[in-house]
Amino acid sequence: MKRILALLSAALLLWVQPAAAQSILRDAETEALLNDMARPLFIAAGLSPANAKVVLIQDSSINAFVAGGQIVYVHSGLIDAASSANEVQGVIAHEIGHIVGGHAVFQNDGGYTNISILSLLLGVAAMAAGSGEAGTGILMAGQRAAIGKYLAFSRVQESSADAAGAKFINSAGISGKGMLSFFDKLTAQMHRYGYYTSNPEVDPFAQTHPMSQDRVETLKADLMNAPSWNKPLDQNLEVRFKRVQAKLRGYVSDPKDTLAKYPPGNQSVEAHYARAYAYHKSGYPEQAAAETQALVKAEPKDPYFLELEGQIMLESGDPRGAIAPLREATALSNNAPLIASTLGHALLATEDKANLDEAERVLKQSVARDNDNPFAWLNLGTVYDRKGDEARTALATAERAHMMGDVGTALMSSRAAMARLPQGSADWVRAQDINMVSQTAWDEMRKKKGRQGQ
């Protein structure tokens, strides 16, 4: 997987390693869908969609969480397990309830602990992994202190988030059926793993989270009495969700599992999408290209199909061939930053000096609209290096290092940029900002190291 990701140019499924050491998956189509799904819920909650967002985490577990700020983190496993976009909206609404409620997450040594909020408790997770004895042990009285320590949201906070989520769903005019059906899935899963038991040691009221079955009963009245309960689902969102779900399955899952789930006889858009990724991961570029060509033939103006076509060409050693579909995908997607950064990478990969100006233009546009793309900064730095612009090469390196948490490189590169840029210019001020933040972080690291050595 890492070998493949090293080749990816950030427009398709791009990995970013945050401080919490969890992998964030970035994809233009997926992010657009999640933002469209969450937008009415953010508005209903009184949050600005410009300042709030949903981030996808590479993790097969069924989970979502908040960790400070106005960001909802959703695991890829939740997308895989959901039957509809409406179910995911129910989970997002619940998470927004935590944000609006100001529910603090557990902090340990200055770092946030990611919290499971869907009642898949530690014991259930252990049982699901095949360790029944370990799961039972976690649920014993002697382990309750550990559960209480590492699961930060209290039962009251969970119930409060449920109530707030139901309110936001109803206010947004979205059916609450998905919220209830997803909680029903969780209840069934807990039954399957033997969580519900007559064992007196397993006291539902002693758990940090309320039980899913109790939460469903509490939610029913609020959701079922709302005018939007029987409102038809947004079919545009549902169709897009099935596409994204298939794309993620093709990208994340074992190719054998993907091909079993979407056999060649299945000629749906979702199946072509999933198989294209599965074949691409498996090192079969011709089969991957054939699946992608079927998608482009069906919808020749779909930017995400064109993006995939260009990506496969690029990674198959044909960067020149990749430019046309990626250029069209960028235009059709209103210059989506992640797609534009892939176009910039393809232009660079031709090693043709005639393409440097266009590469610089599209990459600068990409980072201007999305500053959280380290690969785009890497490519932009390469453009500057090939043009002999040492100052901006150093600044781009500082930007990327700062984003990746590489304090030492950010500090040195920002100093180098400041030394070469006109003092007071916009780029010089930006280099100074990075330098000041990096210097503070560097000093704190040295102080901490000194305390540990005492």
Identify what each model region corresponds to.
Residues 192-193, 317-320, 352-356, 387-395, ...:
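Alpha-helical linker/edge segments of TPR/alpha-solenoid repeat scaffolds
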Residues 269, 303-304, 320, 337-338, ...:
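Helix-start (N-cap) detector for alpha-helical repeat units in TPR-like alpha-solenoids
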Residues 279, 313, 347-350, 384, ...:
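Residue at a conserved register position within TPR or TPR-like alpha-solenoid repeats
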Residues 274, 308, 342-343, 379, ...:
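Canonical tetratricopeptide repeat
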Residues 26-28, 32, 54, 149, ...:
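Extracytoplasmic and endomembrane cell-envelope/extracellular-matrix remodeling and assembly machinery
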Residues 96-113, 129:
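Catalytic Zn2+-binding segment of zinc metalloproteases
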